[in-house]
Amino acid sequence: EISECLVGSEMCIRDRPRGIEGLIADANKHGIKFGIWIEPEMANTTSELYEKHPEWVLKAPNREIVLGRGGTQVVLDLSNPEVQDFIFGIVDNLMTTYPEIDYIKWDANMSILNHGSQYLPSDQQSHMYIEYHEGFKKVCERIRAKYPDLTLQACASGGGRANYGVMPYFDEFWVSDNTDALQRIYMQWGTSYFFPAIAMASHISAAPNHQTFRVIPLKYRIDVAMSGRLGMEIQPKNMTEEEKTLCRKAIADYKTIRPVVQFGDIYRLVSPYDRLGVASLMYTSPEKDKAVFYWWKTEHFVNQHLP
């Protein structure tokens, strides 16, 4: 388990004396590709990075800095080329040291609340947000140029990075921290108007759900997750053998329909927002010779006549 150590400090491992090498070895032993969750745009006011470079964080002049998680989190100023080099170096060092890394979840758990750059001159402060994202883009371009086969997920407390600007550099984005399957039907329905299924990370999560505390049958959670880019957000050690068998079958089935779901055309058949008690959509292959049909019951009505 990678500990929740200070963002901006050296990565630390708790209860893993073999370090990341040991985690990668364990993953390889079980035939699993290894991925890691990082948050390179963030720092903490109590971290080594902040102590060395307090001028690297976003901060409005003559204002007290607004802090995020834990009362210490801050956002690094990506308009600053030195910060760009530092953030690229985080990924580059990881990939150079551990070339077996196949996947990176790039998180950002604080919005830009301090609207000021300590790097930009006063006459460019109004462009801070634009310059931040231009710097972010430069970092992404460097990562993609050097590691074209690395799978990257854009994650920002959920869907904060769901935009066309990051899609050239990331393979998928995290739709929402809310993985409640019933609510995901609504969220993914709306998201599908703007983004294809291949971009929507859609994961099977535990029950009770960690956000809504709702208990939803595993089969229902699987069926909803399979309508996007399928993943698992659940601890195998907490699953029964029956549940593991069901998930193994779901993953195998998804691999057969994946080309249609991720590269096909979408047909919206019944919107969950119509409040008919059901939602339904269908993907078809470009040649229209294959189709995948989804149908979910969303509400219970007396004497309900289903389409």
PLM regions and their residue ranges:
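Single conserved hydrophobic/aromatic residue that forms the stacking wall/gate
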Residues: 1-8, 12-13
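Conserved, mostly hydrophobic/aromatic
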Residues: 27, 87, 107, 152, ...
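Hydrophobic faces of well-ordered beta-strands that scaffold small-molecule active sites
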Residues: 34-38, 104-106, 153-154, 232
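Active-site beta-loop-alpha junctions enriched in small/polar residues
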Residues: 39-43, 108-111, 155-159
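Glycan-recognition surfaces
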Residues: 49-85, 130-238
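An active-site-proximal structural segment forming one wall of the substrate-binding cleft
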Residues: 76-106
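Catalytic cores of secreted or luminal carbohydrate-active enzymes
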Residues: 219-271
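Carbohydrate-binding surface patches
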Residues: 272-307
